[in-house]
């Protein structure tokens, strides 16, 4: 069975070059060697039923001409919408996995309980990925739209007004 392999080094995603296009590696085995301690996460399948796996690597792949590392945001311009959205989900779950290795109650190691939950090996506390509710607002006047440009944007990229919603708002 072939899997899509979403492989991240920090926030950079491994892309496979196919002619003049880019995609996520699709193969039976991971396209790069796994370390013994690498945790491979099972992520929900794509719309066509192809299974998805994701993991983190410590250093970027630079020695293989078939692959290129690309930031998650810039990959929007290189991947299909479905694969880009799946990449975002994979990164979210890998970040959660990296930051929930130990129980917040007793400090014992956490172990995967389901594909998206962990259980403490000592006190049985369960944790799931947290939701960070955010809003995006379209401010318009007639045919004009208010767009914002943050200083940390790397190009002439503009977006709608957005922010996080606090509990009770």
Language-model segment annotations:
Residues 159-169:
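The catalytic Nudix box helix
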Residues 87-135:
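Acidic, metal-coordinating catalytic segment for phosphate/diphosphate chemistry
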Residues 114, 121-160:
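N-terminal strand-loop-strand
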Residues 41-46, 118-120, 139:
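Short acidic-hydrophobic surface loop/beta-edge motif
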Residues 42, 54, 102, 136-138, ...:
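Conserved hydrophobic/aromatic beta-strand scaffold that supports enzyme active sites
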Residues 1-81:
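N-terminal alpha-helical interaction blocks
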Residues 59, 152-153, 165:
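Residue-level signature for short turns and capping positions that connect secondary-structure elements
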